[in-house]
Amino acid sequence: MIFRSKAPLRLGFAGGGTDVSPYSDEYGGYVLNATVDMYAYCTIEVTNDNRVCFYAADREEIFEGNSLEEFELDGNLDLHKGIYNRVVKQFNHGRPLSFRMTTYSDAPAGSGLGSSSTMVVAILKGFVEWLNLPLGEYDVAHLAYEIERIDVGLSGGKQDQYAATFGGFNFIEFYKEDKVIVNPLRIKNWIINELENSMILYYTGVSRESAKIIDEQTKNTKEKNSRSLEAMHELKADALIMKEAILKGDLKTFAEYLGKSWEAKKRMASSISNSYLDKIYEVAIETGAYAGKVSGAGGGGFMMFIVDPTKKITVSRELNKMGGHTMNFHFVKHGTQGWRV
């Protein structure tokens, strides 16, 4: 038997960082994001040789071993192992499974599109299909969060898991005790078309480790760093304004607050921007972009810009001279999907 699954990556428009503890526990967080037609993919081929093989095709990393109740997390494909460990323990009565798994993603790790969390969701969805697990969207997203953040111990927020699971444009609220509310936004097609037409997605060519940035941000929150906290309060307020703007099709306000959000985000942690990203931003604005920001924790990965559609090619041409490259994309309405072959 073969089971396949995929989960969409997301663009973070506003509020990113307010979904990270301890901020979300103490103040509550708001995030506005949308999924795009770039995915994390998983294939599970069921075997009967009492072996497990994880193959991350895009990273050319492989792990093979005898089927065990639990694999040690030693730095080699820990996310894959962490998911396996949890699934075996929680849903298979501790009985080892035998299979070969292949995974890959349309975006590199460190892209700022939520690629690692989205991969966890895709792999989990594969197991849901195979083992027929009775898990709804909230269950899958929360389980993905627990595996990545608690079991495997990677720092980060919660928005990516929920975006990948639910799909579409979402306004997501985060509160203490792991309370999360996903509000799917009903955005008119003309607004989605206009936003798509007005957006440039630019890969800076620089991968980064979001965990380091998030650790600095968490430290600032715990120490009640006023500059960092005020910036996070501002990001949260901006998310509300941008939600209203996108629902009404007011892209002028949407762009204005996207730019404001980026300025606020840079105050959250010193590693969020750098001279290379600042230069890219400068070139985009000089050639006609209204505003922009980095998607995800910052430090590199993808940047997005809002431009007049008639200037899109001109701005893209200049950005492509900066060492990275623009990427075509479309927004998608569906979240993670799984099927058997």
From Swiss-Prot:
Its EC number is 2.7.1.168. GO terms for molecular function: ATP binding; fucokinase activity; metal ion binding. Pathway: Nucleotide-sugar biosynthesis; GDP-D-glycero-alpha-D-manno-heptose biosynthesis; GDP-D-glycero-alpha-D-manno-heptose from D-glycero-alpha-D-manno-heptose 7-phosphate: step 1/3; Cell surface structure biogenesis; S-layer biogenesis. It comes from Aneurinibacillus thermoaerophilus. Mg(2+) binds at S116, E148. The keyword Manganese does not apply. Belongs to the GHMP kinase family. It comes from the Bacteria. This is D-glycero-alpha-D-manno-heptose 7-phosphate kinase. Keywords: ATP-binding, Carbohydrate metabolism, Kinase, Magnesium, Metal-binding, Nucleotide-binding, Transferase. One of its GO terms (biological process) is S-layer organization. It catalyses: D-glycero-alpha-D-manno-heptose 7-phosphate + ATP = D-glycero-alpha-D-manno-heptose 1,7-bisphosphate + ADP + H(+). Pfam families: GHMP_kinases_C (PF08544), GHMP_kinases_N (PF00288). The record marks R10 as: Transition state stabilizer. ATP binds at G110, S111, G112, L113, G114, S115, S116. The active site is at D160 (proton acceptor).
